[in-house]
Amino acid sequence: MANSTFSGPIRSESTLKTVSKNATTGAITEVTTLGDGPVSLSDGDVTLTNATHSGRVLLVPDGSQDNTYTLPAPIAGSVFRFVYAGGAADATDAIIVTPGNTNFYIRGVSFHDSDNAISSVFSDGNSNSSIQINVPQAFDVTIIGKDSTNYQIFGSVTSATAPAFADQ
């Protein structure tokens, strides 16, 4: 694959994909897709992939049960943006987990309590690999692959119950 340098805009009739190449094996891994429409996640547990989900808005439904969304192994530059798409406050939780205990979240989210209090909720930065968004009324949470171990997380959650970071 050749390298190209562009001095003007790049146009695509469909999407643009960013990839990473393993320096040892030469294997190509798709990191993110730019330009595709949003992905409506199913009402159930979902294992995400970079090829299908990274770089796109992920619409989280008003679940009929607590749903767990499992991220793929972190790749620097991968981006997962979760947006609550329910039409009313949800009576269940959205849980977003990394693929394992060695992949954890750094930073946190702003919590907008529906009783008018505003605060921030932070991961511990060294082992929290799960965020539980409790009975949301709204949320917009972005998770970015920081490197091959960690995810950076930020965004906002509106609910009567604070979101919670935890170890898996």
Please place each PLM-identified region on the residue numbering:
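Short aromatic-glycine motifs in intrinsically disordered, low-complexity regions
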Residues: 1, 67-70, 131
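Long, leucine- and charge-enriched amphipathic alpha-helices
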Residues: 2-3, 11
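Exposed extracellular interaction/assembly regions and N-terminal maturation sites
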Residues: 9-11, 15-117, 145-168
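Structured beta-strand segments within beta-sheet-rich domains
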Residues: 118-139
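Short tryptophan-centered beta-strand motifs in secreted/extracellular beta-sheet-rich domains
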Residues: 140-144
